[in-house]
């Protein structure tokens, strides 16, 4: 079987039936404790619903994920003894994985509250084009833009 086969569907989550939320819960999960991860994510969604009245937390989550996910990134390639940073498009599966990773990282770095509150704050900031995870995406895009002269080295 080839390595580039299709990915297994993780199915929808318990509350919303959304596969992306289910993947996010899996990304948050530590040591196989999925119930704890689901509680954190759903509590974060409840906080979003409470603080942003009239907003659907799932829509805030989707908007935040689209604002965090990078479109291009730089990848290293060695050409004739020199290493170049080559801007390349990011595949959709990697876009989601990077968005989850950055959201998790920068939410954890926030102040000393519960993890659900940290996720809620980072998601709300990301939905409003603010927050550390969006800054990380902008930084990655800036790096790709700065190195677009090496785009002809794409592999």
Curated annotation (Swiss-Prot):
CDD domains: uS7_Bacteria. GO terms for biological process: translation. Keywords: Ribonucleoprotein, Ribosomal protein, RNA-binding, rRNA-binding, tRNA-binding. It holds the Pfam family Ribosomal_S7. GO terms for molecular function: rRNA binding; structural constituent of ribosome; tRNA binding. InterPro entries: Ribosomal_uS7, Ribosomal_uS7_bac/org-type, Ribosomal_uS7_dom, Ribosomal_uS7_dom_sf. One of its GO terms (cellular component) is small ribosomal subunit. Transmembrane segments: none annotated. Belongs to the universal ribosomal protein uS7 family. PANTHER family: RIBOSOMAL PROTEIN S7. One of the primary rRNA binding proteins, it binds directly to 16S rRNA where it nucleates assembly of the head domain of the 30S subunit. Is located at the subunit interface close to the decoding center, probably blocks exit of the E-site tRNA. Part of the 30S ribosomal subunit. Contacts proteins S9 and S11. NCBIfam families: rpsG_bact. This is Small ribosomal subunit protein uS7. It comes from Chlorobium limicola (strain DSM 245 / NBRC 103803 / 6330). The gene is rpsG.
